[in-house]
Each structure stands twice: as structure tokens, then as C-alpha cells.
């Protein structure tokens, strides 16, 4: 009996270590406008309510501390995303995982590519390398430093690129 109780205790203690890593699934990527949009920013935040609330607070105050919470998904465009995976994943990239996505009119999303420095954006640049170069001191979130205009995007172009096939018409 003591053995069973001991094994149960070990299993219970192991769960928090596993829970510190978030692995995004296609269902985690929804209509862009369903995400929370911080005041004065163009990106949208997704995740569990508690995560979104923390991420919004960090974004709105600009006090990132140790960075965004694990489980945060940030999207500027419906076809790209970054998710704070955490754990031991991508230490050199701040724990972020980058995605190329295909949003579908039926509301679903396909993950075309996921990873670290090997994932490229619509300009064929490494997402991670660009984010690290531009905003390493801001948990790799470029809008704190340069914003979309820093990579040559006008407000009109950003709005056009934010058109999302998953959103109800």
C-alpha cells in the first residue's frame, strides 16, 4: 500500500513539470479578431483566459518582466503566429515556437510549418532571427520596438493582410 501511495505522490509531483510546456494545436489558432487586441497594438493575443489576461497586462504596461506566460499565442496576421511554448523548448529563442499557418474558410487552421529559426515569414526571413534581432529585450515581440512599419508595412497593408478566411463574414 505504501508503494502505491508513494508512486501516486511521485506522479502528482511530476505533473507540474510537464504542464510548464505548451504545445499549440491547430484548434488553438482561430479567427484573428477573436483574440484580445492590446490597446495601441496591432497583434492579437490568444490562450486560456488567465493567460490572455496576464499577457494583456504585460503588453499594456510594457512591463514584461520574465516575458509572456507559457501558453500565450501572438498573431499579427492569420497566416503566421508565435506561441510561448516554454519548458526547455528553444531557450535561445526565448521559449517561442513560430508557425506558418493556413486559415480555412470553414474556420479551421492547418499548421504548415512549426519550429524555431527554420520557420520563415512571408518575406522569407527567419521569424526567430528577425524577432531576436529586433526585440530580444522585449521577449521577441517586435511591436514594442519597431512595429510593422519597421519592416516596411503600412497600416493599410497590415489591415489588408489581417483579412482572415476563418472569421464569419
Model-assigned labels for residue ranges:
Residues 6-14:
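Bacterial N-terminal signal peptides
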Residues 15-19:
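Sec/Tat signal peptide C-region and signal peptidase I cleavage site
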Residues 20-42, 65-169:
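Sequence context surrounding c-type heme c attachment/ligation sites in exported
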Residues 48-65:
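N-terminal post-signal-peptidase region of extra-cytosolic proteins
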Amino acid at each position: 500500500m505504501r508503494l502505491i501511495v508513494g508512486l501516486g505522490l511521485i506522479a502528482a509531483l511530476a505533473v507540474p513539470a510537464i504542464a510548464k510546456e505548451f504545445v499549440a494545436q491547430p484548434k488553438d489558432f482561430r479567427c484573428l479578431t477573436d483574440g484580445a487586441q492590446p490597446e495601441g497594438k496591432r497583434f492579437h493575443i490568444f490562450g486560456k483566459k488567465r493567460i490572455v489576461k496576464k499577457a494583456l497586462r504585460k503588453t499594456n504596461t510594457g512591463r514584461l518582466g520574465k516575458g509572456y506566460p507559457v501558453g500565450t499565442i501572438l498573431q499579427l496576421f492569420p497566416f503566421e503566429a508565435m506561441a510561448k511554448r516554454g519548458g526547455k523548448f528553444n531557450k535561445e529563442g526565448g521559449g517561442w515556437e513560430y508557425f506558418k499557418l493556413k486559415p480555412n474558410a470553414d474556420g479551421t487552421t492547418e499548421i504548415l510549418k512549426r519550429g524555431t529559426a527554420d520557420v520563415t515569414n512571408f518575406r522569407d526571413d527567419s521569424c526567430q532571427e528577425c524577432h531576436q534581432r529586433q526585440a530580444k529585450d522585449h521577449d521577441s515581440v517586435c511591436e514594442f520596438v519597431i512595429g510593422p512599419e519597421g519592416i516596411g508595412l503600412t497600416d493599410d497593408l497590415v489591415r489588408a493582410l489581417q483579412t482572415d478566411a476563418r472569421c464569419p463574414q
